[in-house]
Protein backbone atom coordinates (compact mmCIF):
# COMPACT_ATOMS: atom_id res chain seq x y z
CA UNK A 1 0.00 0.00 0.00
CA UNK A 2 1.11 3.52 -0.75
CA UNK A 3 0.32 6.71 1.15
CA UNK A 4 0.05 10.36 0.26
CA UNK A 5 -0.72 13.64 1.99
CA UNK A 6 -3.31 16.27 1.15
CA UNK A 7 -4.46 19.52 2.71
CA UNK A 8 -7.95 20.85 2.17
CA UNK A 9 -7.20 24.56 1.98
CA UNK A 10 -9.08 27.32 3.85
CA UNK A 11 -11.43 27.97 0.93
CA UNK A 12 -12.46 24.29 0.82
CA UNK A 13 -13.43 24.59 4.50
CA UNK A 14 -15.16 27.97 4.07
CA UNK A 15 -17.12 26.75 1.04
CA UNK A 16 -18.35 23.65 2.87
CA UNK A 17 -16.60 21.23 0.49
CA UNK A 18 -14.70 19.10 3.03
CA UNK A 19 -17.23 16.27 3.02
CA UNK A 20 -17.59 16.30 -0.77
CA UNK A 21 -13.82 16.16 -1.30
CA UNK A 22 -13.22 13.39 1.25
CA UNK A 23 -16.16 11.44 -0.22
CA UNK A 24 -14.49 11.45 -3.65
CA UNK A 25 -11.41 9.75 -2.21
CA UNK A 26 -13.41 7.24 -0.18
CA UNK A 27 -15.65 6.36 -3.13
CA UNK A 28 -12.53 5.30 -5.04
CA UNK A 29 -11.49 2.96 -2.22
CA UNK A 30 -8.86 5.30 -0.80
CA UNK A 31 -8.54 4.91 2.96
CA UNK A 32 -8.17 7.88 5.34
CA UNK A 33 -5.46 6.92 7.86
CA UNK A 34 -4.80 10.40 9.29
CA UNK A 35 -7.15 13.37 9.66
CA UNK A 36 -6.80 16.70 11.47
CA UNK A 37 -8.84 19.91 11.45
CA UNK A 38 -6.59 22.78 12.48
CA UNK A 39 -5.39 26.33 11.97
CA UNK A 40 -1.97 26.11 10.36
CA UNK A 41 0.81 28.01 12.12
CA UNK A 42 3.19 30.26 10.20
CA UNK A 43 6.02 27.83 11.03
CA UNK A 44 4.06 24.92 9.53
CA UNK A 45 3.20 26.95 6.41
CA UNK A 46 6.83 28.03 5.92
CA UNK A 47 8.04 24.42 6.27
CA UNK A 48 5.36 23.11 3.92
CA UNK A 49 6.07 25.63 1.18
CA UNK A 50 9.83 25.97 1.74
CA UNK A 51 10.57 24.70 -1.81
CA UNK A 52 8.66 27.75 -3.15
CA UNK A 53 10.42 30.36 -0.98
CA UNK A 54 11.52 33.30 -3.11
CA UNK A 55 8.98 32.63 -5.85
CA UNK A 56 6.55 35.39 -6.83
CA UNK A 57 3.48 33.65 -5.37
CA UNK A 58 5.09 32.54 -2.06
CA UNK A 59 3.88 35.36 0.24
CA UNK A 60 0.33 35.32 -1.15
CA UNK A 61 0.17 31.54 -0.78
CA UNK A 62 1.37 31.67 2.84
CA UNK A 63 -1.15 34.37 3.77
CA UNK A 64 -3.96 32.41 2.12
CA UNK A 65 -3.02 29.19 3.93
CA UNK A 66 -3.00 31.09 7.25
CA UNK A 67 -6.37 32.78 6.55
CA UNK A 68 -8.52 30.03 8.04
CA UNK A 69 -8.72 26.42 9.16
CA UNK A 70 -7.45 23.55 7.04
CA UNK A 71 -7.92 19.79 7.03
CA UNK A 72 -4.71 17.73 6.89
CA UNK A 73 -5.21 14.20 5.60
CA UNK A 74 -3.09 11.11 5.03
CA UNK A 75 -4.56 8.74 2.46
CA UNK A 76 -3.68 5.12 1.67
CA UNK A 77 -4.36 2.89 -1.35
CA UNK A 78 -2.52 0.99 -4.06
CA UNK A 79 -0.92 3.58 -6.39
CA UNK A 80 -2.26 6.23 -3.99
CA UNK A 81 -0.06 9.12 -5.11
CA UNK A 82 -0.98 8.78 -8.78
CA UNK A 83 -4.65 8.11 -8.08
CA UNK A 84 -5.05 11.07 -5.70
CA UNK A 85 -3.34 13.47 -8.10
CA UNK A 86 -5.70 12.32 -10.86
CA UNK A 87 -8.77 12.88 -8.64
CA UNK A 88 -7.44 16.30 -7.52
CA UNK A 89 -6.66 17.57 -11.05
CA UNK A 90 -4.11 20.03 -12.42
CA UNK A 91 -2.92 22.92 -10.23
CA UNK A 92 -4.49 25.45 -12.60
CA UNK A 93 -8.27 24.93 -12.48
CA UNK A 94 -8.54 26.00 -16.14
CA UNK A 95 -6.26 23.10 -17.09
CA UNK A 96 -7.81 20.60 -14.68
CA UNK A 97 -9.81 17.74 -16.15
CA UNK A 98 -13.59 18.10 -15.96
CA UNK A 99 -14.86 16.04 -13.05
CA UNK A 100 -11.67 16.44 -11.02
CA UNK A 101 -11.91 18.32 -7.71
CA UNK A 102 -10.12 21.39 -9.07
CA UNK A 103 -11.84 21.15 -12.46
CA UNK A 104 -15.22 21.19 -10.80
CA UNK A 105 -14.78 23.49 -7.79
CA UNK A 106 -11.51 25.51 -7.86
CA UNK A 107 -11.37 29.23 -8.63
CA UNK A 108 -7.69 30.20 -9.05
CA UNK A 109 -4.23 28.61 -8.95
CA UNK A 110 -3.70 29.76 -5.34
CA UNK A 111 -7.27 29.12 -4.23
CA UNK A 112 -7.44 25.68 -5.84
CA UNK A 113 -8.99 24.00 -2.76
CA UNK A 114 -6.42 21.29 -2.15
CA UNK A 115 -2.71 20.65 -1.79
CA UNK A 116 -1.52 17.15 -2.73
CA UNK A 117 1.99 15.76 -2.33
CA UNK A 118 3.66 15.22 -5.70
CA UNK A 119 6.16 12.51 -4.68
CA UNK A 120 6.84 9.93 -1.98
CA UNK A 121 9.68 12.09 -0.63
CA UNK A 122 7.35 15.09 -0.36
CA UNK A 123 4.66 12.94 1.27
CA UNK A 124 7.16 12.01 4.00
CA UNK A 125 8.40 15.61 4.43
CA UNK A 126 4.98 17.27 4.31
CA UNK A 127 3.01 14.80 6.42
CA UNK A 128 5.65 14.90 9.17
CA UNK A 129 4.93 18.63 9.62
CA UNK A 130 1.40 17.76 10.77
CA UNK A 131 1.42 14.13 11.96
CA UNK A 132 3.55 11.99 14.25
CA UNK A 133 3.78 8.28 13.38
CA UNK A 134 1.46 7.41 16.29
CA UNK A 135 -1.30 9.58 14.77
CA UNK A 136 -1.50 7.47 11.61
CA UNK A 137 -4.07 4.74 12.16
CA UNK A 138 -3.89 1.42 10.32
CA UNK A 139 -7.18 -0.45 9.96
CA UNK A 140 -8.99 -2.77 7.59
CA UNK A 141 -11.77 -1.52 5.31
CA UNK A 142 -14.79 -3.80 4.97
CA UNK A 143 -14.58 -3.33 1.20
CA UNK A 144 -10.80 -3.77 1.03
CA UNK A 145 -11.10 -7.18 -0.64
CA UNK A 146 -12.85 -5.49 -3.55
CA UNK A 147 -10.05 -2.99 -4.20
From Swiss-Prot:
What would you give as a GO molecular function for this chain, any one? metal ion binding
Subcellular localization, per the record?
Cytoplasm
Q: Which GO terms describe its biological process?
A: CTP biosynthetic process; GTP biosynthetic process; UTP biosynthetic process
InterPro entries under this entry?
Answer: NDK-like_dom, NDK-like_dom_sf, Nucleoside_diP_kinase
A Gene Ontology term for the protein's cellular component: cytoplasm
Keyword Protein transport found: no
Which Enzyme Commission number(s) are on file for it? Answer: 2.7.4.6
Keyword Disulfide bond set for record = no
- Residues the record marks as active site: 115 (pros-phosphohistidine intermediate)
Entry cofactors: Mg(2+)
SMART domains reported in the protein's UniProt record: NDK (SM00562)
Query: Which residues does the annotation say bind ATP?
Result: 9, 57, 85, 91, 102, 112
What does the UniProt keyword field contain?
Answer: ATP-binding, Cytoplasm, Kinase, Magnesium, Metal-binding, Nucleotide metabolism, Nucleotide-binding, Phosphoprotein, Transferase
Q: Show the catalytic activity.
A: a 2'-deoxyribonucleoside 5'-diphosphate + ATP = a 2'-deoxyribonucleoside 5'-triphosphate + ADP; a ribonucleoside 5'-diphosphate + ATP = a ribonucleoside 5'-triphosphate + ADP
What is the protein's known function?
Major role in the synthesis of nucleoside triphosphates other than ATP. The ATP gamma phosphate is transferred to the NDP beta phosphate via a ping-pong mechanism, using a phosphorylated active-site intermediate.
Q: Which HAMAP family does the entry mention?
A: NDP_kinase (MF_00451)
Q: Report the sequence similarity comment from the record.
A: Belongs to the NDK family.
Q: Note the subunit structure.
A: Homotetramer.
**Protein name, per record:** Nucleoside diphosphate kinase
Recorded source organism is Fervidobacterium nodosum (strain ATCC 35602 / DSM 5306 / Rt17-B1)
Question: Mind giving the lineage of the organism this protein is from?
Answer: Bacteria, Thermotogati, Thermotogota, Thermotogae, Thermotogales
Amino acid sequence: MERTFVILKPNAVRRGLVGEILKRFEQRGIKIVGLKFLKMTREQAEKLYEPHKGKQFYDELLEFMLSGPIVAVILEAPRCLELVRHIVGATDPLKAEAGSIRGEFALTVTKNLIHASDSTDNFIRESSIFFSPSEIIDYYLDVQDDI
